Amino acid sequence: VSDTSGGENSRRPYLWEYRQEHREVVSAALEQRFDVSGENGLADQMERVAAQLVDEYWHDNWRDIVGIVDGSFLEGYDDFNIGAAFRNAAVVSTTYALLSRCGMQPGDYFEHEDFLNVFDFNTPQTVAALGTAISQSSELVLRQLEITIKNYEREKLAERSESHERTDLHPQRGLSDSRPEPD
């Protein structure tokens, strides 16, 4: 028995798509939500939002992360360097995910060397810790983008509907009388 096909009255989910026309509203929403300016472009803004969220994640979870590095390439690092490696790996990965989901070309913004810290997280526990930080950080941003883009599209659709629902009647004329004229 399979429950993967659409039912008779099922609706397909609306998957938002970032387009250039969304740039200003998306940048403004990110600035309002995360207090990070978009003056240097959306890619830079996303990277700085990612850095802010990853810093918050590290601040809340650093003790747990430092406690699971045994057996990984991070073993032997002091707390400061574990934190630097974690933040670098999480920021670049989160930014990559955000740019990729928005249809931007992450390869235009990153080089191979930017991802080298990711390879230090080579045990199941360290991979899980890094993955959780990336997932939680990118989810916060992507949910904000989803809300912003959906609202923008609804407003655009409402404006379009409103302009098409207007009558093209001249106010002084009105509708013509459909009754036959008396003889």
Please describe what each predicted stretch is.
Residues V1-L175:
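N-terminal accessory/interface modules of nucleic-acid-binding and processing proteins
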Residues P182-D183:
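Short acidic DE-rich linear segments
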